[in-house]
């Protein structure tokens, strides 16, 4: 199909045409500003060699722009009422594949197969943003990048530095696996229905190797989780659930050069890595 034959989708027109009813439980907000999908595609640097996986295509407003640039687009949609709309509007395009499923239950490796250049693009429902990001980053999938539209506050948490109120486990997770770049801000007026918060399009560029090298990744994230689950407590109290005798835990803190009276929110990524490696050493002695 000639890309010139791919017509832009007018969200409001399709919503009226199909008498679509928005689902509050699914957190649906569809784009109506034509500049946003184009900026997302440009920000994701989509090109003709790319397989693009889109989560939450809605009525296909962003999907159409992806189809103009990508080799292939696989869209994952949970809402059964959107399946016939997407099929009717985009089903004839040989570059388009639609999967009716929950993105949290999808095996992305089955979709990716042998593809070498895979990018994920998504307008994520706010209520599942963090679980989806955790799954995508820790799942070991071969994504070059994730370009996602999310709540402004979540984007700020991803980019947060130590000693900041937004700094937490999500900051560590994202910065461990990715470099981040803000593509653009998106005000509520760009959607129907209008959300009550501002949104941001952010690109997560997957690093070839994690930003910090750790011996035991599972333990590393366990320590991070303990530190931020009890963020007002000292590291010493927060890591009491780690199964290591007191005297060995003291040695681990000393070896890592970290005062156990500090709070988790003061530690850099590198310091969490050093503490994790020191604890791992004594756990395996």
Swiss-Prot record:
Q: Tell me what organism the protein belongs to.
A: Clostridium perfringens (strain 13 / Type A)
Q: What is this protein called?
A: Ribosomal RNA small subunit methyltransferase A
Q: Which GO terms describe its molecular function?
A: 16S rRNA (adenine(1518)-N(6)/adenine(1519)-N(6))-dimethyltransferase activity; RNA binding
Q: Which UniProt keywords apply?
A: Cytoplasm, Methyltransferase, RNA-binding, rRNA processing, S-adenosyl-L-methionine, Transferase
Query: What is the purpose of this protein?
Result: Specifically dimethylates two adjacent adenosines (A1518 and A1519) in the loop of a conserved hairpin near the 3'-end of 16S rRNA in the 30S particle. May play a critical role in biogenesis of 30S subunits.
Q: Does the keyword RNA-binding apply?
A: yes
Name the principal localization, coarsely classed. Answer: cytoplasm
The record lists its disulfide bonds as none
What are the subcellular locations of this protein?
Answer: Cytoplasm
Please give the superkingdom of this protein's source: Bacteria
């Amino acid at each position: 199909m000639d890309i010139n034959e791919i017509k832009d989708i007018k969200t409001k027109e399709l919503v009226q045409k199909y008498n679509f009813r928005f689902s509050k439980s699914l957190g649906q907000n569809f784009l109506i500003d034509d500049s946003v999908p184009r900026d997302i595609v440009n920000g994701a640097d989509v090109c003709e060699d790319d397989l693009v996986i889109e989560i939450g295509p809605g009525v296909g407003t962003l999907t159409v722009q992806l189809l103009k640039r990508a080799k292939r687009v696989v869209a994952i949609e949970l809402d059964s009422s959107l399946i016939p709309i997407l099929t009717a509007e985009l089903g004839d395009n040989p570059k388009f594949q639609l999967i009716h499923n929950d993105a949290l239950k999808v095996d992305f490796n089955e979709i990716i197969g042998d593809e070498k250049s895979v990018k994920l693009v998504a307008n994520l429902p706010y209520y599942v943003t963090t679980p989806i990001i955790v799954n995508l980053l820790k799942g070991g999938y071969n994504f070059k990048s994730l370009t996602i539209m999310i709540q402004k506050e979540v984007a700020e948490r991803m980019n947060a530095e130590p000693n900041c109120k937004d700094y937490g486990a999500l900051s560590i997770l994202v910065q461990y696996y990715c470099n981040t770049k803000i593509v653009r801000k998106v005000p509520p007026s760009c959607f129907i229905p209008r959300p009550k918060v501002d949104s941001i399009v952010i690109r997560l560029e997957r690093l070839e190797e994690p930003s910090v090298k750790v011996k035991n990744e599972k333990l590393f994230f366990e320590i991070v989780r303990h530190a931020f689950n009890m963020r007002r407590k000292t590291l010493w109290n927060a890591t009491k659930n780690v199964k290591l005798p007191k005297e060995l835990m003291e040695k681990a803190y000393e070896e890592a050069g970290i005062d156990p009276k500090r709070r988790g929110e003061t530690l850099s990524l590198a310091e969490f890595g050093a503490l994790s490696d020191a604890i791992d050493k004594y756990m395996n002695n």
